[in-house]
Structures are given as C-alpha cells and as structure tokens.
C-alpha cells in the first residue's frame, strides 16, 4: 500500500516563481530517492474559516497564499529510507536551496493510503 507525505504552507504570493523553482528541484530529488510522484498546488479558492481552515492553520498573512502539496511513495519503508537521503542531499540544504517561505508554519505529516480510486 502506498504512503503519502502531506504538506501545507503559507508562501509569500510574490514568491510564486521562486517557490515553483524550489519545488521543481525538490521534486527531482524526492523522485531520485524513491518517491513515485510529487504534487504542488498553489491556492486558488481557499476560504478563511471561523473555527478552522487552511489559512488559519498556517497563519496565512494577507500577502501570502496557501500551498498544498503531497508526495507519494511505494511504501513507508521506502519513504523512511528515501527521506533520510533527501534530507542529506546537498541540493536541498538551506544554503543551496533556501525555502522561500516560513518553515516554522509548515504543517506536514505521513499517511497510510486507505483509498486510492
């Protein structure tokens, strides 16, 4: 059964092109280390909530856009091994490829896929 890493972040709207380049580099690295796919989505219709919402979860500011991303892996074992290699890869080190957003507000988690229709 596939495994998925999911991410939500608030990215400065003016940094969309910078974010895309960062994400393209990261996607190549993840795929080299075993990921099946990497999907990056730029917020288009992401309403603010009263109790909960994507914007509230990442403390999205007026000049930011919510980004929703996920990475699929063939298994948790492949993900665990691949993630170690990804984190050590020189192409994704902060001095080489800094995150174009506030990583302190990044939300992420690993999920077992239970339906894939």
Residue ranges of model-derived segments:
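Long, hydrophobic N-terminal alpha-helical segment
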Residues: 1-21, 25
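Short, well-ordered beta-strand segments in beta-rich or mixed alpha/beta enzyme
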Residues: 4-11, 49-86
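Short, well-structured hydrophobic secondary-structure segments
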Residues: 16-17, 28-34
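Short amphipathic alpha-helices in soluble, non-transmembrane regions
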Residues: 20-26, 82-90
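Glycine-rich beta-strand-turn "strand-cap" elements at beta-sheet edges
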Residues: 31, 37-62, 88-117
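Conserved long hydrophobic alpha-helices within structured protein cores
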Residues: 33-42, 73-75, 81-82
């Amino acid at each position: 059964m596939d495994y998925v890493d999911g991410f939500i972040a608030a990215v400065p709207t003016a940094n969309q092109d910078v974010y895309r380049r960062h994400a393209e580099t990261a996607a190549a690295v993840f795929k080299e280390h075993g990921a099946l796919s990497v999907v990056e989505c730029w917020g288009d219709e992401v309403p603010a909530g009263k109790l909960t919402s994507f914007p509230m979860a990442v403390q999205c500011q007026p000049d930011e856009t919510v980004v929703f991303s996920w990475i699929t892996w063939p298994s948790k074992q492949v993900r665990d091994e691949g993630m170690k290699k990804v984190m050590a890869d020189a192409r994704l080190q902060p001095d080489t490829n800094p995150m174009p957003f506030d990583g302190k507000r990044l939300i992420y988690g690993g999920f077992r896929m239970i339906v894939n229709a």
